[in-house]
Amino acid sequence: SEADLNHPMLRDVVPMAPKRTLVTGCDGQLGHAVRRLAEERGVAKDFDFCDIDTFDMSVPDAYAQYDGSLYGTVINCGAYTAVDKAETSEGRAAAWKANATGPALLARTCSEHGITLVHVSSDYVFDGTAEVHDEDEPFSPLSVYGQTKAAGDIAVAGCPRHYIMRSSWVIGEGRNFVKTMRGLSDRVAAPDDKLDKITVVDDQLGRLTFTRDMAEAIFHVLDAKAPYGT
């Protein structure tokens, strides 16, 4: 109020800045959507966006660059998503590092500072035998990728203030299945390209997760202060 602003004891008091939001994986499909939505809502000034090149959440020393007391929320959009490559020796190590170690360190840091952690998971933590998955279904991953995501979920669930959001077939700005197929088709059609055919699985069922929808869902649970959990 005007009286507070002119009160002799309060005149020189500097108002406490609002808590900031850190978004990891900002260069991925979902990270792009979260950034765009923050800009549209006029709150991007209160956000910090980072990708693995500037903040590798799986490296303990990387956390020294951030003052945890300044943040109220972390939205983890970062992940290793090369499902097939995760079955190789090199990919397996990278997947566990990004999808399990990283979220575990994030969860520990958020717990220490009372930060709300929003973690985006995957339907790969299940075996796909159920027609409908719910929040209480036990983990039953079939792939290395699914195992790493399940491990990350378990770590995040240990953070008192957490939301775990599950995605399926992610479609958005950046690399996605539709753009990949179009690019491969262009290569097959090109006379000077050695690629002569495309092989695609035809026995999978899934539901598209549009990144805009997921970004809006994240903002909704935060704005509504929904009960913590999955």
Task: Pin down the residues of each PLM region.
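Rossmann-fold cofactor-recognition segment
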Residues: 48-59
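Mid/C-terminal beta-alpha module of Rossmann-like enzyme folds, strongest
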Residues: 215-218, 224-230
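Catalytic helix-loop patch of NAD(P)-dependent Rossmann-fold dehydrogenases
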Residues: 97-105, 124-175
